[in-house]
């Protein structure tokens, strides 16, 4: 990921109000940020933000009551050495939390080295938790996929397929049936956790749906506030295809998945043909996926039933054919 836009200034601007940050000194170092190597080597945002640690240093160092008390108990020589080591790490910025006064030597060294120094009355633990969550969001893997992203029965569903298959028309019909639009045409996905991918609409396309022959439709204005969603977790991908029956698998024996940002997402394929009610089929696919997430697999149950019937046919068909 490009980390050039992530620097002390941008992090301060995004978090100053929530964390009650004040920029004490080191304004000249506003461009300080994270190297691509440090971000690539980080296993989580916890590797980028943490309490003062000179042995295994974090990129953003937070000094709270305990760290300042420890600093005050040191000799002048040890204080100077620790401050020199801290500044030598070249962190994007330092935070003195808990409402304690920043040590004068730290302020002086930050001023001389143009190291941004922030202060806040909030506790160090609260600052670290908030910054870790913030870093995990802005550094999370991202991708933009083509399709219509909808909230169907509380599940995030992405309609995909070749151009001209009627994805937007299908999305419009599903919206008219009470479901919600997240994004049309381009959907921004981000992996915010180990087990889920979240999808949002780009600001430029917010609430808009493009339908051939009708142009752009403002779904929020036409159908109301409840017809749009800000974000949804991606749980199902519905691929629309147009192909002969001979190439279409009616009963797939194995569940289909698509890799999205390293996470397997369930996928169903629906054939587009004249006279088919695609909206009903999509709703049925979503309901079936919900059952599968609850451990109910209709195909597996049928195969088990069939196997039992083959082993003991008389139990299934006690009567005799005449």
From Swiss-Prot:
Oligomeric state and interaction partners are given as: Homohexamer.
What GO terms in the biological process aspect are recorded for it?
A: regulation of carbohydrate metabolic process
Read off the InterPro entries from this record: HPr(Ser)_kin/Pase, Hpr_kin/Pase_C, Hpr_kin/Pase_Hpr_N, P-loop_NTPase, Ser_kin/Pase_Hpr-like_N_sf
Q: Which reaction does it catalyse?
A: [HPr protein]-L-serine + ATP = [HPr protein]-O-phospho-L-serine + ADP + H(+); [HPr protein]-O-phospho-L-serine + phosphate + H(+) = [HPr protein]-L-serine + diphosphate
Which cofactors are reported in the record for this sequence? Answer: Mg(2+)
Q: Which SUPFAM superfamilies match?
A: HprK N-terminal domain-like, PEP carboxykinase-like
UniProt gene name = hprK
Task: Give the protein's recorded name.
Answer: HPr kinase/phosphorylase
Q: Which residues bind Mg(2+)?
A: 168, 210
Q: Which UniProt keywords apply?
A: ATP-binding, Kinase, Magnesium, Metal-binding, Multifunctional enzyme, Nucleotide-binding, Serine/threonine-protein kinase, Transferase
Query: Highest taxon of the source?
Result: Bacteria
Present the record's domain note: The Walker A ATP-binding motif also binds Pi and PPi.
Annotated active site residues, numbered on this chain, are 146, 167, 185, 250
- What is the originating organism of this protein? Paraburkholderia phytofirmans (strain DSM 17436 / LMG 22146 / PsJN)
* Important for the catalytic mechanism of both phosphorylation and dephosphorylation: annotated segments: 209-218
**The family this protein is said to belong to:** Belongs to the HPrK/P family.
What PANTHER family does the annotation carry? Answer: HPR KINASE_PHOSPHORYLASE, PROTEIN YJDM-RELATED
Recorded hits in Pfam families, A to Z, give: Hpr_kinase_C, Hpr_kinase_N
**Region Important for the catalytic mechanism of dephosphorylation: what ranges?**
271-276
């Amino acid at each position: 990921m490009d980390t050039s836009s992530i620097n002390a200034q941008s992090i301060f601007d995004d978090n100053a109000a929530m964390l009650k940050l004040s920029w004490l000194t080191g304004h000249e170092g506003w461009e300080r940020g994270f190297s691509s190597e440090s971000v690539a080597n980080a296993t989580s945002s916890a590797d980028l933000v943490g309490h003062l640690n000179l042995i295994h240093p974090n990129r953003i160092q937070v000094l709270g009551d305990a760290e300042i008390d420890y600093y005050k108990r040191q000799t002048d020589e040890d204080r100077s050495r620790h401050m020199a080591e801290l500044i030598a790490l070249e962190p994007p910025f330092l935070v003195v939390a808990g409402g304690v006064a920043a040590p004068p030597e730290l302020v002086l060294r930050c001023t001389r080295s143009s190291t941004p120094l922030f202060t806040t009355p909030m506790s160090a633990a609260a600052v670290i938790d908030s910054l870790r969550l913030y870093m995990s969001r802005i550094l999370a893997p991202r991708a933009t996929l083509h399709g219509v992203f909808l909230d169907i029965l509380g599940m995030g569903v992405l309609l995909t397929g070749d151009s001209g298959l009627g994805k937007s028309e299908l999305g419009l019909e599903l919206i008219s049936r009470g479901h919600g639009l997240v994004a049309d045409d381009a959907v921004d996905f981000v992996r915010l956790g180990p087990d889920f991918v979240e999808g949002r609409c780009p600001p430029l396309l917010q609430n808009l749906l493009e339908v051939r022959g009708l142009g752009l439709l403002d779904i929020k204005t036409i159908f109301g506030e409840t017809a749009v969603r800000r974000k949804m977790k991606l749980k199902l991908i519905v691929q629309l295809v147009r192909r002969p029956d001979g190439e279409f698998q009616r009963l797939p024996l194995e569940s289909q998945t698509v890799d999205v940002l390293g996470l397997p997402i369930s996928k169903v394929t629906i054939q587009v043909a004249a006279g088919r009610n695609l909206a009903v089929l999509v709703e049925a696919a979503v309901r079936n996926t919900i059952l599968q997430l609850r451990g109910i697999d209709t195909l597996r149950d049928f195969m088990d039933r069939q196997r039992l019937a083959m082993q003991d046919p008389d139990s299934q068909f006690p009567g005799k054919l005449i």
